[in-house]
Amino acid sequence: MCGIVGVVGNRNATDILMQGLEKLEYRGYDSAGIFVANANQTNLIKSVGRIADLRAKIGIDVAGSTGIGHTRWATHGQSTEDNAHPHTSQTGRFVLVHNGVIENYLHIKTEFLAGHDFKGQTDTEIAVHLIGKFVEEDKLSVLEAFKKALSIIEGSYAFALMDSQATDTIYVAKNKSPLLIGLGEGYNMVCSDAMAMIRETSEFMEIHDKELVILTKDKVTVTDYDGKELIRDSYTAELDLSDIGKGTYPFYMLKEIDEQPTVMRQLISTYADETGNVQVDPAIITSIQEADRLYILAAGTSYHAGFATKNMLEQLTDTPVELGVASEWGYHMPLLSKKPMFILLSQSGETADSRQVLVKANAMGIPSLTVTNVPGSTLSRESTYTMLIHAGPEIAVASTKAYTAQIAALAFLAKAVGEANGKQEALDFNLVHELSLVAQSIEATLSEKDLVAEKVQALLTTTRNAFYIGRGNDYYVAMEAALKLKEISYIQCEGFAAGELKHGTISLIEEDTPVIALISSSQLVASHTRGNIQEVAARGAHVLTVVEEGLDREGDDIIVNKVHPFLAPIAMVIPTQLIAYYASLQRGLDVDKPRNLAKAVTVE
């Protein structure tokens, strides 16, 4: 949600800002803008729509060595140029970009900014007017004005501020929103995601909450809000530029679906040695052994991945597992067991709802494990332990490979704990071999893309509604499959436990309603789900079946290679990812950038 880029120094700021914003498109946005300055002039350009629309408005004379840019995902005010960032102060002297939500912006407007004229309806404009007031009316220095504003502002924010009268400096501050400093020779940068600046530098510095940074071309000064200077080491971001591009693919989502066999094999090489022995941080294993209950907290696709691993974790670790929606737990944490441990699943490691839960867990002394794709992310820094899923950059808004990688990573964790406990089922579970078979199963499914596209064209091209049904782990996959379809095709789709159809949902079935049935696990499960298929077919539903090999019958639509039941959700979800992809494609939609959605939800 939203993206920030900024640069000061001996570089072409316009090019860097635009390239950086393009790299942040995947986070989701509805408008964009840049502010560029040099010794002789300043330029502020904003646009509603895509980065390409902004680029079309930039003239050849828009040049400078310092600038800030922003992609906006509307939270306060509609998507208009007036509401797009950067925003300016009352006189236009100060320019600000902001990610986050200022909770007390109405109080600030009433208490401090009476008589000010505002162009838009955003909370960010309130903030930059406040800074401008403190300098131009109260005669504070820029730094003192920024600090005073920060002491008043409540909520989440990542700020990058420029003074058009002294354009050799960028002022930065953050609280609860991600922000990084990029380090260069003769230039320095700020960004909300390392991906935005990876072409310019691989050396980054973390900024923690309630810290202020002053950037010039030759120096980075980090302080707390009281002015105490802080020492902060830098780190190298291991991002491959080839992983960020689409290559020959028309969309990132299809590329990322195709990468899943490689991701499975990467996880094997990461979490198992050459002899197949599982290697997981012993401290994580011990912490789980000491817990009497595991609580998986997540949102969206990661929440569904948690469900898909619940049975496996319980069976292999002998520890009860509960699932929680992070956005709900942030407000009301239920009665916990005596020795709880939290597992937070987040592709980005920046999910604001999950962080809200983690802050509470830390305050309560509850050990936590973050399972994420991004090293150095907020959740990974603030949790007790971190386990990386090594899926590589995931650019498409609709998550695919992160979901399957989360399940596979948790399989290694479950087996490691089970082995440490001497659980025979864990000792017998040849995870390296079984996950290799999963990779082969994915490849087999991917070789049937034309078949899936054909089935989708007949089923989903014009419909407004659809349903997924399944039992056991297939129900959990159905929830994820339904989310994927609704995210990128805009088809109203729900995933239901097949056994619940008779308890209400079947009333929604009418002539030609698409119902996609998932069948794996056992003959008993298959028999019961096929009974549900007959029920919906009798009411006119158009049924498509995705069936595990060995449970298939003549007339089934998509057959998936049989894999170990613990890992079946990985194999079974692949056809549903392709179904969502082709449904979106055939409906003429932007697969990678669905409307109203953001890749990383960094505000609560």
From Swiss-Prot:
Residues 284-423, 452-594 form the SIS domain. Disulfide bonds: none annotated. The active site is at C2, K599. Its main location: cytoplasm. It comes from the Bacteria. Pfam families: GATase_6, SIS. Keywords: Aminotransferase, Cytoplasm, Glutamine amidotransferase, Repeat, Transferase. The keyword Iron-sulfur does not apply. SUPFAM superfamilies: N-terminal nucleophile aminohydrolases (Ntn hydrolases), SIS domain. InterPro entries: GATase_2_dom (IPR017932), GFAT (IPR005855), GFAT_N (IPR047084), GlmS/AgaS_SIS (IPR035466), GlmS/FrlB_SIS (IPR035490), Ntn_hydrolases_N (IPR029055), SIS_dom (IPR001347), SIS_dom_sf (IPR046348). Homodimer. HAMAP family: GlmS. This is Glutamine--fructose-6-phosphate aminotransferase [isomerizing]. It comes from Streptococcus pyogenes serotype M3 (strain ATCC BAA-595 / MGAS315).
